[in-house]
UniProtKB/Swiss-Prot annotation:
Function: Involved in the acceptance of foreign DNA which is modified. Restricts both adenine- and cytosine-methylated DNA.
Organism from which the protein derives: Escherichia coli (strain K12)
Gene3D superfamilies: 3.40.1350.10
Protein known as: Type IV methyl-directed restriction enzyme EcoKMrr
Keywords, in A-Z order: Restriction system
GO molecular function: DNA binding; restriction endodeoxyribonuclease activity; type IV site-specific deoxyribonuclease activity
GO cellular component: bacterial nucleoid
A GO BP entry: DNA restriction-modification system
One Pfam family named in its UniProt record: Mrr_cat
Region annotation Disordered: where it falls in the sequence: 120-142
Length: 304
């Protein structure tokens, strides 16, 4: 027997989490949903091309939809919990979900962007969600493009969520890894983390040449609020103290308009917000891996 589609996992995941006010480990939610759906051993053994178990993958996508609907959240790595809105929804819907309710949760919030913590930045504030009937009428190529977009969006949300949970020192290392993948520094050792007490607002230094004559200074912050002009002025002062010509300020949050105006008014300062950082990590496969899917296409020249 085949494993039920991910939309069928939405209600079991939702109902199980409603019994766990302190949250539950994702692996426990996977098993509870599989039990609720009556999956046998053969169904639980099925895997997707990446090697992940199908039922765990579909339970994960069900939880993704609940998060986008504002009904659930990830408290930490591998721990899920309903939001107050989620508990309210379950309390007001004691009867089994109708097909219409399931479809609404499965498809209406596909492109809603997650904001995993108050200090996170919205990755893409506005986008239209495709109707499930519209998707059903789409060509396979269109559905493939939409699926790829959903996967990228989901990974982007997960990357940002994990960035917000790592230690400040680990975040600084990650930022330097990203900059190295972008081509800064001939060798990874050319990018040095210097953050710590008395760092003067400098978290990393990149040597652009072997003698270290040309350097880029980096500030990497998991900011709890939008970064304003005062923070950039302090960073600019730290750059001046190093007689530096170039500086990069990277944050998981965003920048105020005043901060951006200040950065444009001085030479050599580049700003990277959470959205840009996440997409740089995805594009350069820092903390992210990818798999190749071969899509067949007829070679007309061969038959001529």
């Amino acid at each position: 027997m085949t494993v039920p589609t991910y939309d069928k996992f939405i209600e079991p995941v939702l109902r199980y989490l409603a019994t766990k006010p302190e949250g539950a480990a994702a692996r426990d939610v996977h098993e509870a949903a599989a039990d609720a759906l009556g999956l046998d051993d053969s169904q639980r053994a099925k895997v997707i091309t990446s090697g992940q178990l199908v039922y765990k993958n579909r339970a994960g996508w069900a939880h993704d939809r609940l998060k986008r609907a504002g009904l659930s959240q990830s408290l930490s790595r591998g721990k899920w919990c309903l939001t107050p809105a989620g508990f309210d929804w379950v309390a007001s819907h004691p009867q089994p979900m109708t097909e219409q309710e399931t479809n609404h949760l499965a498809f209406a919030f596909v492109n809603v962007k997650l904001k995993s913590r108050p200090d996170a930045v919205d990755l893409d504030p506005k986008a239209d969600s495709p109707d499930h009937e519209e998707l059903a009428k789409s060509s396979p190529d269109d559905r493939l493009d939409q699926a790829l977009k959903e996967l990228r969006d989901a990974v982007a949300d997960e990357v940002l969520e994990n960035l917000l949970q790592v230690s400040p020192s680990r975040f600084e290392v990650i930022v330097l890894d990203v900059l190295h993948r972008l081509g800064y520094g001939g060798h990874r050792d050319d990018l040095q983390r210097v953050g710590g007490t008395g760092d003067g607002g400098i978290d990393g230094v990149i040597s652009l040449d072997k003698l270290g004559l040309e350097k880029v200074y980096v500030q990497a912050k998991r900011w709890q609020n939008t970064v304003g002009r005062p923070e950039l002025q302090a960073f600019y002062g730290a750059l001046a103290g190093q007689k530096a010509k170039r500086g990069v300020f990277i944050t998981t949050s965003g920048f105020t308009s005043q901060a951006r105006d200040f950065a444009q008014s001085v030479e050599g300062m580049v700003l990277v917000d959470g959205e840009r950082l996440v997409h740089l990590m995805i594009e350069n496969e820092v903390g992210v891996s990818s798999r190749l899917l071969k899509v067949p296409k007829l070679d007309m020249d061969y038959f001529e």
